[in-house]
Amino acid sequence: MSVMQNNSEKSKWFLPGILGGLATTMKHLLKNLFNQKKMMTLNYPEEKYEYSPRFKGNHVLTVKKDGSLRCTACMLCATNCPAECIKITAAEHNDPTVEKFPISYEIDILRCVFCGFCEEACPVDAIRLGPEWQTPGVNGANFIYDINHLAYRPNLKGGILTHVDDEERHKAGI
């Protein structure tokens, strides 16, 4: 036995709801169509958004003026990383004044949350989060950055140089 329910109360609000949603959509469509100067959308990639200087993008390993890595393989960045995306393999250096250095330094960008903990933990300013953020690629191997990708780029797209002068750091109190 089936029971018929009276849905007349609900059905009388159906058409006004549809018309109200349609009116809102048409209002925004016409506003954006005829007033494109105030539109918030950028035509990417022709127009690029200007990010703040404090923006944290892709990682950069800094090098000294002699071309050697600033990293001392202390593992503080890898220890502080909440995503565990930094892998460092350390080795002893030939120079007795240098304790160790990284022979392998990899960052898995797909796991990274760009929190900046690695940058804050580094005692020698060896890792920075630079201005680049676009990382195109088709497979996961393209997103594991090694020492060559992280450090040996003469000039990044934001004007940040990868080499750091020790004298300037000491003057600044870093």
From Swiss-Prot:
[4Fe-4S] cluster 2 binds at residues 81, 112, 115, 118. It catalyses: a quinone + NADH + 5 H(+)(in) = a quinol + NAD(+) + 4 H(+)(out). It is an enzyme of class 7 (translocase). It comes from the Bacteria. Residues 61-91, 103-132 form the 4Fe-4S ferredoxin-type domain. Its cofactor is [4Fe-4S] cluster. HAMAP family: NDH1_NuoI (MF_01351). NDH-1 shuttles electrons from NADH, via FMN and iron-sulfur (Fe-S) centers, to quinones in the respiratory chain. The immediate electron acceptor for the enzyme in this species is believed to be ubiquinone. Couples the redox reaction to proton translocation (for every two electrons transferred, four hydrogen ions are translocated across the cytoplasmic membrane), and thus conserves the redox energy in a proton gradient. GO terms for cellular component: plasma membrane. This is NADH-quinone oxidoreductase subunit I. Belongs to the complex I 23 kDa subunit family. It is a peripheral membrane protein. NDH-1 is composed of 14 different subunits. Subunits NuoA, H, J, K, L, M, N constitute the membrane sector of the complex. One of its GO terms (molecular function) is iron ion binding. Its EC number is 7.1.1.-. It is found in: Cell inner membrane. Binds 2 [4Fe-4S] clusters per subunit. Its main location: membrane. [4Fe-4S] cluster 1 binds at residues 71, 74, 77, 122. Keywords: 4Fe-4S, Cell inner membrane, Cell membrane, Iron, Iron-sulfur, Membrane, Metal-binding, NAD, Quinone, Repeat, Translocase, Ubiquinone.
